Amino acid sequence: PILKPFTCMDLRQIADSGQCFRMTELSDMPGRFSVISQEHYLEIEQLECDWKQTDETRFEAKTFAFYCKKEELSFWERYFDLDQDYEAYINSVRKRDSYLQHAAQAGSGIRILNQDPWEMILTFVISQQKTIPKIREAVEALSRRFGTEHRTAVLRGSQEKEITWHSFPTP
């Protein structure tokens, strides 16, 4: 795995935010998530956590393990918006605005994902009148039916496992 430290990133918050529908926790490895975007597959997990103090705000400094090819890491860094300083955004909220302060802290692990516009529009259309689990099912069914099949080897414990997945269909 490729290890990278970040603050203001929580995999579960991102997966459950309704922002994307192809980020799911692996049933056989709690805390590890698979993410599919365009022609890319990633497995990612949080390994350790520490605390970082800035001004009056305390942030979790987390180390994440990216299970992908080195040449794909830059794609995922852009996807998760990792070049942006979310701590600075949260710290810029006025201290006397308790409502916004609370909102910033509650969602401090959510990042703005740089998703493929086509996939984002279609999943938005699919999302009307559905729950997040139903949207995920619909998106996966659409991808299996019309997307391109891929195979990727990922490290699971001490063994490599081949994963079969489908990219989201293109226009």
What kind of region is each of these model predictions?
Residues 1-171:
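HhH-family (HhH-GPD) DNA N-glycosylase catalytic core used in base-excision repair
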